[in-house]
Amino acid sequence: DDCTTYCYGVHCCPPAFKCAASPSCKQT
């Protein structure tokens, strides 16, 4: 699993996603 973004220091987001308002990812 490729992680390019870490939301809140722990939640891993894949390359095509960014951090949402909560500790989760949303597609961009």
From Swiss-Prot:
The organism's place on the tree of life at top rank: Eukaryota
**Any keyword Disulfide bond?**
yes
As one GO molecular function, the record gives: toxin activity
Annotated GO CC locations: extracellular region
Entry keyword set: Disulfide bond, Ion channel impairing toxin, Knottin, Neurotoxin, Secreted, Toxin
What's its job? Probable neurotoxin with unknown target. Possibly targets ion channels.
Q: What is known of its domains?
A: The presence of a 'disulfide through disulfide knot' structurally defines this protein as a knottin. The cysteine framework is VI/VII (C-C-CC-C-C).
User: What protein name is recorded for this chain?
Assistant: Conotoxin Cal6.43b
- Naturally occurring in which organism (per UniProt): Californiconus californicus (California cone)
